[in-house]
């Protein structure tokens, strides 16, 4: 599993994942902006939605 905003999330059905795939398994509402921009981090490093995600990664997605 990976961790998303502190919650364990199991990714399944694919061999490899990118950050945007996480949204299929973690409920994060992108339809209503709650800040000026969306911050996405993988293991503390700023990332974009095409960044690869691996087992045991820590993902953070939040508005700033």
Where do the language-model regions lie?
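Ubiquitin-like/PB1-type beta-grasp interaction modules and other compact soluble beta-rich domains
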Residues: 1-64
